[in-house]
């Protein structure tokens, strides 16, 4: 697994948290795992969840909302059923990239990412959830991805209602799109 950061000597990260003023971009590769199933079901905002323990730079980041770019890599594996890490009674169909179209595979797409505890839902595990700003017809659990975090939008916070949470996420998406308009990072060697 490749992890990169523009800071020098990033390890050990856990004692030296990376903050909103961290040097960007932060680049890493990972795979998509099932989460709690709330992004699509409760919020109407599907997320690609990343195993935070496998990407030390994510665990070292301040909790909050980040923006950047993501690329879903072609994953040649047959579909299979697996149990969700977050909900042991939930069996998920791992499609990898089998049902994605050619324009979605390897495309560099904008994203917003939540890193934290999701106080509205009172999570007991820290998570990293990426909302890719694109409408997908199918899921792609198990797919490999590359992620480039370009900046920090805001700290993690609690909300008084589900509607307030959804409104804030939509605002995060809007701000993220504005910040990334015309970004040259889409042509970075990282995506090759």
Swiss-Prot record:
Q: Which GO terms describe its biological process?
A: FMN biosynthetic process; riboflavin biosynthetic process; riboflavin metabolic process
Reactions catalysed, as given in the entry: riboflavin + ATP = FMN + ADP + H(+)
> What detail does the entry give on cofactor binding?
Zinc or magnesium.
Q: Which residues bind Mg(2+)?
A: 47, 49
Q: Which GO terms describe its cellular component?
A: mitochondrial inner membrane; mitochondrion
Pathway(s) of this molecule: Cofactor biosynthesis; FMN biosynthesis; FMN from riboflavin (ATP route): step 1/1
| Location of the active site | 129 (nucleophile)
Top-level division of the source organism's lineage: Eukaryota
Q: Which cofactor does it need?
A: Zn(2+); Mg(2+)
A GO MF annotation of the entry reads: metal ion binding
Name the Gene3D superfamilies for this protein.
Riboflavin kinase-like
Keywords per UniProt = ATP-binding, Flavoprotein, FMN, Kinase, Magnesium, Metal-binding, Nucleotide-binding, Transferase, Zinc
Q: Which InterPro entries match?
A: Riboflavin_kinase, Riboflavin_kinase_bac/euk, Riboflavin_kinase_dom_sf
Q: What is this protein called?
A: Riboflavin kinase
- Give the originating organism: Yarrowia lipolytica (strain CLIB 122 / E 150) (Yeast)
Question: What broad taxonomic lineage does this protein's source fall under?
Answer: Eukaryota, Fungi, Dikarya, Ascomycota, Saccharomycotina
């Amino acid at each position: 697994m490749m992890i990169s950061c523009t800071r020098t000597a990033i390890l050990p990260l856990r004692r030296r948290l990376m903050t909103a003023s961290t040097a960007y971009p932060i680049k890493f590769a990972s795979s998509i795992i099932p989460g709690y199933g709330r992004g699509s079901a409760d919020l109407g905002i599907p997320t690609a969840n990343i195993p935070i323990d496998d990407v030390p730079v994510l665990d070292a980041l301040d909790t909050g909302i980040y923006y950047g770019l993501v690329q879903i890599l072609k994953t040649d594996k047959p579909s299979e059923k697996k149990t969700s890490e977050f909900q042991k009674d939930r069996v998920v169909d791992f499609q990898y990239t089998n049902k994605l179209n050619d324009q979605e595979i390897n495309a560099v797409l904008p994203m917003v990412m939540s890193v934290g505890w999701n106080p509205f839902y009172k999570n007991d595990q820290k998570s990293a959830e990426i909302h890719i700003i694109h409408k997908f017809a199918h899921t792609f659990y198990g797919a490999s991805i590359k992620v480039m975090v370009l900046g920090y939008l805001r700290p993690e916070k609690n909300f008084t209602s589900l509607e307030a949470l959804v409104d804030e996420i939509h605002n995060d998406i809007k701000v993220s799109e504005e910040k990334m308009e015309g970004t040259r990072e889409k042509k970075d060697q990282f995506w090759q």
